[in-house]
Regions:
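Acidic, glycine/proline-rich low-complexity segments that act as flexible tails and inter-domain linkers
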Residues: 1-48, 101-119
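Iron-sulfur (Fe-S) cluster-binding segments and ferredoxin-like electron-carrier domains
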Residues: 68-80, 106
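Residue-level detector of well-ordered alpha-helical segments, enriched
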Residues: 47-51, 82
Length: 119
């Protein structure tokens, strides 16, 4: 998967939130406030929270969540090995279906590495 394909998935999240924000401003505003509050660094670092969110996204089978939280975890300093290990924890907890959702994780890692000139 190319980085442009991942960017399309990420832009779909933004489009959804913008569309819903116009039709359901109270709900999306409340969700955004909750998101900011939870994202604030307290006992867990941003990196740790993003790795948890990634594992939960894999367990839930949410491809958009996988791309978003892979990106955010990398931005927070997570390594490729940490991303894969978080994915394996998801598989441990959610079984075979979660294993199949390591496919988008691996594609996201590859796409972000290509974008940043890593391999």
């Amino acid at each position: 998967m190319e980085y442009d394909d991942v960017k399309v998935k990420l832009s779909e999240i933004e489009e959804l939130l913008n569309t819903l924000g116009k039709k359901h401003p109270k709900e999306i505003s409340a969700f955004s406030r909750f998101l900011r509050e939870v994202a604030e660094t307290k006992a867990l670092t941003t990196r740790e929270k993003e790795l948890i969110a990634l594992a939960l996204g894999i367990s839930a089978g949410c491809e958009w969540c996988i791309y978003l939280h892979t990106q955010k975890a990398l931005e927070a300093g997570a390594t490729k090995e940490e991303l894969i290990e978080a994915g394996l924890v998801a598989v441990l907890m959610a079984g075979g279906p979660a294993l199949m959702h390591l496919i988008p994780l691996m594609k996201a890692i590859e796409a972000f590495e290509k974008e940043h000139g890593e391999s």
